[in-house]
Amino acid sequence: IALQCYKYGAKSVTIGYRNNPMGFKWPEGMKEVHYLDKLEGSKAIFKDGHSQNIDALILCSGYLHYFPFLADSLKLKTHNRLYPPKLYKGIVWQDNHKLFYLGMQDQFHTFNMFDCQAWYARDVIMDKIKLPSDSEIDQDINEWVAKEEKLQDPLQMIDFQTEYTKDLYSASNYPKIDFELIRKHFKDWEHHKEDDIMTYRNKSFSSPVTGTIAPLHHTPWSQAMDDSMETFLESKS
């Protein structure tokens, strides 16, 4: 969102972070400061003491797990993390095996992970996957959480979530997909962002299903001001 604002003409963009800065090499006119503490008219005062006048404020809450329609005994309560506790295989509610949560994790993998979760949940519902004993479920959750808590950087996080998704994949008949290629793509993508946050979108990757390499977009992202499908699909020599 911050980069979109910058791209389309904002003279300055200030990002207030909740816990840790993203730490990318921002272009001139963009910066990160500790989160917004209070507003006094048009003046924003941040937790680190920094203050400045602002024209617009965009509240980005991040992923918040909020299930007011569930009883407390069924409610997932967690911050945004790669392995929320009390979910066996990241899916099955530990205290009630008829309740399934999908997509609750902080994400590198997205739809391929969601698919594997859905396949796994389907097979539990259809009794194709037999859940282990309560003690084994507890041990499995604790082992995954312990691994997650030792992660120190994005590359380790990519490895962790790849292994988690592969674990789900191995338990069902999900169609063939190249997880090692996905792992490599994510790490390349992470390096591209670290190298230049303004140009990482200009890269091309191959499909982990077909192997087909996607064509590069005809216009660098920072110069592409028209997001219509007609312009996006246009061929330019």
Which stretches of residues belong to each language-model region?
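Flavin (primarily FAD) cofactor-binding/catalytic cores of flavoenzymes
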Residues: 1-134, 149-237
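Post-kinase regulatory C-tail/linker adjacent to protein kinase catalytic domains
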Residues: 135-144
